Amino acid sequence: YHGEGTCTFYGTANSNQMLMEIMGLHLPGAAFIHPHSDLRHAYNIAATQQAISISRKSNDVRPIGKTIDERSFVNAVIGLLATGGSTNHTLHLPAMAAAAGIKLLWEDFEDLSEITPLLAKVYPNGSADINQFHAAGGMSFIIGELLDEGLLDGSAKTIWGENLFDYISCLLYTSPSPRDNLP
């Protein structure tokens, strides 16, 4: 962004955005939107409205402890592997899982790495920055491809819709997409 916001390379901060999106804790499509755009402003308003709609003031209460579970963490590891995300998350994700009472081991990362394709090469793993990744389909593409291949658990709960399948239906993903267009 070359200003306020996270860096344009795919480091820990942008990997966090990817994780929140693939775990269903962002609004659909929210990761990597430029911080000073009209779209970011619209997402901020929509996020506030969604937070209110799933709070105690509604009949659809979704506290984070009831939203994320083992499926969410497996999806997170697969997302991290498929996007070449920050290796810092090999420490952060097991700690987050432990805080939720879930055991996530490095061996789980190893096992999942054997079945998960690398779908994006964003700097420092390639020449494209995060803005180019987002413009080429970004998380919509990644989530759609991984769901189509049966690598993500689409029944995982999200803050939007009932599950990850509902979540992706809000995005502009159509399959099959040409993988050549994604950095």
Task: Give short role names for the model-derived ranges.
Residues Q17:
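Active-site phosphate/pyrophosphate- and oxyanion-stabilizing loops and adjacent acidic/basic residues
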Residues S113, A120-L172:
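Phosphate/diphosphate-binding loops
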Residues F9-G11, M20-E21, L25-S86, L91-N125, ...:
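Accessory "access/gating" subregions that flank catalytic or transport cores
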Residues Y173-P183:
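Single conserved hydrophobic/aromatic residue that forms the stacking wall/gate
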